[in-house]
């Protein structure tokens, strides 16, 4: 599911799905241009943080009662997790996979389709702009200035390049609202692990 500016009380939705018997639940914040009426705004952040806290506490309670469920944004592996490369560079857009349009054009991912500066090639000619692939290959938590001091950088891998581009005009930028929410989700995930380890 997706929550927006118009339904910030998403913890109720998640818990309702759990009450219906779903064990694997994903409800994510919408990412939209700030001109959209449903876009998450900076002033929504405090309520979203409270919702994450409410959800985390209820998940701990339910797990202890034998009625636990997974909320994907709180899943964290503190002992293993992705390989170092994935922790540094994220999803692999533009390097490990491409979006192929119905007319055969290559873009780093589906969110770049139509952004002509990121047209990498096509099915007839292959990759015609390897410099784009190189640009994405160099995009990681060490090249993103806003990631350098962030405690969550190895859990989000620098965030989404498309969101960075659409909000900052640069794939090495960041989507600050997304960063704030990611830090809170990591905090809640660690809190859940700690609370359940104490029993």
Label every PLM stretch briefly.
Residues 1-97, 114-119:
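Radical SAM enzyme [4Fe-4S]-AdoMet core and its adjacent flexible, acidic
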Residues 101:
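Short, acidic, Ser/Thr-enriched surface-loop or helix-capping motifs
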Residues 113-199:
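Flexible mid-to-C-terminal extensions adjoining Fe-S/redox cofactors in radical SAM and related proteins
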């Amino acid at each position: 599911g997706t929550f927006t500016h118009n339904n910030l009380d998403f913890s109720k939705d998640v818990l309702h799905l759990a009450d219906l018997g779903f064990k694997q639940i994903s409800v994510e914040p919408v990412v939209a241009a700030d001109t959209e009426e449903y876009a998450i705004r900076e002033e929504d952040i405090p309520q979203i943080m409270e919702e994450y806290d409410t959800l985390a506490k209820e998940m701990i309670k339910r797990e202890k009662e034998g009625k636990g469920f997974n909320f994907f944004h709180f899943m964290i592996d503190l002992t293993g997790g992705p390989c170092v490369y994935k922790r540094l560079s994220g999803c692999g857009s533009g390097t490990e996979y491409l979006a192929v349009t119905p007319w055969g054009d290559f873009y780093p991912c589906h969110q770049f389709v139509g952004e002509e500066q990121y047209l990498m090639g096509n099915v007839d000619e292959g990759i015609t702009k390897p410099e784009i692939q190189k640009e994405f290959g160099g995009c990681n938590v060490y090249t993103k200035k806003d990631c350098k001091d962030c405690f969550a950088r190895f859990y989000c891998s620098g965030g989404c390049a498309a969101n960075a581009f659409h909000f900052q005009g640069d794939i090495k930028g960041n989507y600050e609202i997304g960063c704030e929410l990611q830090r809170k989700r990591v905090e809640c995930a660690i809190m859940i692990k700690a609370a359940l380890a104490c029993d």
